[in-house]
């Protein structure tokens, strides 16, 4: 029985940046540092930051006056930003720059009075933050998750209409939704390039290749990680059994019955240490060989805020 590791896999530039912001803030200012929502959706990462002194909260009313707060990689609404400013909280923004790019698209649409349609998953923090960039009461922003949702849209005119997407969606599903939107609203405008981020795209492409050569695909990632769920769904859609796991403790040995090659990948918020712990555990269950699938190389780096960057250089 062999393991085939997907490439690329694991941390993306936005996740690296978000974790660095929390770690540098703790190093410079000391504990506690408050973080609004899990800075990235991974239990192992969050528990590690908690151990260093990060305090994770869901709302700003849980943050004491004069405290430091970090916004998670998923971004926040304008309302949350304004509340932090009103209270005089010191803020470090760990919003992924690619999410910020979508925020700017929504804010521009709001300012121009253009109706906006966001393709995304209801209730996901990124979607909540993105929807919260739109405040034009005379137009509106609407959320769709599927092709079926388009028929329910309360939008009759295609004039002054635009769309954007959550950054961690299924490429295939999103393509279908965009096609259906353009069919119903031929004049609808959208971004020149898909809003789905490079890391999501690359990891989904790697899983396509992985599934072709595996009888089981294990995706290392937490249950609340959107991009990790999409990887598991993609492998299943290709006819290969797939399991989303937080780590080796989640593996059921019965999954390996009749399997010759186990494909392993990791969501963009899952650290490589978890992948390696899964590999080592599988070796105790009969794996004898480990190889890497060829894939694209990622060199993207996002800088941390200037105040933290200056300290980092020193």
UniProtKB/Swiss-Prot annotation:
Binding site for [4Fe-4S] cluster: 12, 96, 197
Regions annotated as coiled coil: none
Keywords: 4Fe-4S, Iron, Iron-sulfur, Isoprene biosynthesis, Metal-binding, Oxidoreductase
InterPro entries the UniProt entry points to: LytB/IspH
Cofactors that this protein relies on: [4Fe-4S] cluster
Pathway: Isoprenoid biosynthesis; dimethylallyl diphosphate biosynthesis; dimethylallyl diphosphate from (2E)-4-hydroxy-3-methylbutenyl diphosphate: step 1/1; Isoprenoid biosynthesis; isopentenyl diphosphate biosynthesis via DXP pathway; isopentenyl diphosphate from 1-deoxy-D-xylulose 5-phosphate: step 6/6
The protein's name: 4-hydroxy-3-methylbut-2-enyl diphosphate reductase
């Amino acid at each position: 029985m062999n393991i085939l590791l997907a490439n690329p896999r694991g941390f993306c530039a936005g996740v690296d940046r978000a974790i660095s912001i929390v770690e540098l803030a703790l190093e410079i200012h000391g504990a506690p540092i408050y973080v609004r929502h899990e800075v990235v959706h991974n239990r192992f990462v969050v528990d590690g930051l908690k151990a260093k002194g990060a305090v994770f909260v869901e709302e700003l009313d849980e943050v004491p006056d004069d405290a430091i707060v970090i916004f998670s990689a998923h971004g926040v609404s304008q309302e949350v930003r304004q509340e932090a400013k009103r209270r005089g909280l010191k803020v470090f923004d760990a919003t992924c720059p690619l999410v910020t790019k979508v925020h700017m698209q929504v804010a521009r649409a709001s300012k121009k009075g253009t109706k906006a349609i966001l393709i995304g998953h209801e209730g996901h923090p990124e979607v909540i933050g993105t929807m919260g960039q739109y405040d034009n009461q005379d137009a509106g922003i609407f959320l769709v998750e599927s092709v079926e949702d388009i028929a329910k849209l309360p939008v009759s005119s295609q004039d002054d209409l635009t769309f954007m997407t959550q950054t961690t969606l299924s490429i295939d599903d999103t393509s279908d939704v965009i096609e259906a939107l353009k069919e119903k609203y031929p004049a609808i405008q959208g971004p020149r390039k898909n809003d789905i981020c490079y890391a999501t795209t690359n990891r989904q492409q790697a899983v396509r290749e992985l599934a072709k050569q595996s009888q089981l695909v294990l995706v290392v990632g937490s249950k609340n990680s959107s991009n990790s769920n999409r990887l598991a769904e993609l492998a299943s859609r290709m006819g290969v059994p797939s399991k989303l796991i937080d780590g080796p403790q989640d593996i059921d040995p019965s999954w390996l019955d009749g399997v010759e090659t186990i494909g392993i990948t990791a969501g963009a918020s899952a650290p490589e240490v978890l992948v390696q712990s899964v590999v080592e555990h599988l070796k105790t269950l009969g794996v004898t060989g480990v190889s890497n699938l060829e894939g694209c190389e990622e060199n993207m780096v996002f800088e941390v805020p200037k105040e933290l960057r200056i300290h980092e250089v020193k």
